[in-house]
Amino acid sequence: MVRITALMSGSILLFALQALAMPVETTSVEPAAEKRGLKLAFKRGEEVEPAEEKRGLKLAFKRGEEVEPAEEKRGLKLAFKRGEEVEPAEEKRGLKLAFKRGEEVEPAEEKRGLKLAFKRGEEVEPAEEKRGLKLAFKRGEEVEPAEEKRGLKLAF
């Protein structure tokens, strides 16, 4: 008896062996570590062990399984999609999630804080650094032409 795993690449061989009247046993494909393997197993309705990598978390979420909120970006995103309360983190992803949830975020001195404040329509003091000049320019404020490169570019 010949044992062949039926895959797209091996289907021609399968038909050739069947034509020769050889007994052929087909087996299902084990869930592979690569993305396409997990997707195929999921489409076939097989149970796939939730992996630690992004694709595993996504599949578990699609199956409706409970996924532990991870500290990494993908964990925060999944928790947000499930409607769970996520503690606002100091890093960019935390500020973004808090902003999407409509929470009040303290305007930070860093670029992301200024961007969020600008999106919320808050008044932001024009800073001397590049991001401050850019925001002031976007708001249509008059910006004094500076001697430095960024000021000249924005004024132009």
Curated annotation (Swiss-Prot):
Record propeptide residues: 22-36, 43-55, 62-74, 81-93, 100-112, 119-131, 138-150
Disruption phenotype: Abolishes the production of victorins.
Source species: Bipolaris victoriae (strain FI3) (Victoria blight of oats agent)
Presence of keyword Repeat: yes
Signal peptide start and end residues: 1-21
Post-translational events: VicA1 is processed by several endopeptidases including kexin proteases as well as the cluster-specific peptidases vicP1 and vicP2 to produce 7 identical copies of the hexapeptide Gly-Leu-Lys-Leu-Ala-Phe, that are further modified to yield victorins. After being excised from the precursor peptide, the core peptides are cyclized and modified post-translationally by enzymes encoded within the gene cluster.
Protein purpose: Ribosomally synthesized cyclic peptide victorin precursor, part of the gene cluster that mediates the biosynthesis of the secondary metabolite victorin, the molecular basis for Victoria blight of oats. The vicA1 translated product contains a 7-fold repeated peptide embedding the hexapeptide Gly-Leu-Lys-Leu-Ala-Phe, that is converted into the cyclic victorin.
Organism ancestry: Eukaryota, Fungi, Dikarya, Ascomycota, Pezizomycotina
Spans traversing the lipid bilayer: none
Pathway: Mycotoxin biosynthesis
UniProt-recorded name of the protein: Ribosomally synthesized cyclic peptide victorin precursosr vicA1
Record bears the keyword Signal: yes
Keywords of the record: Repeat, Signal, Virulence
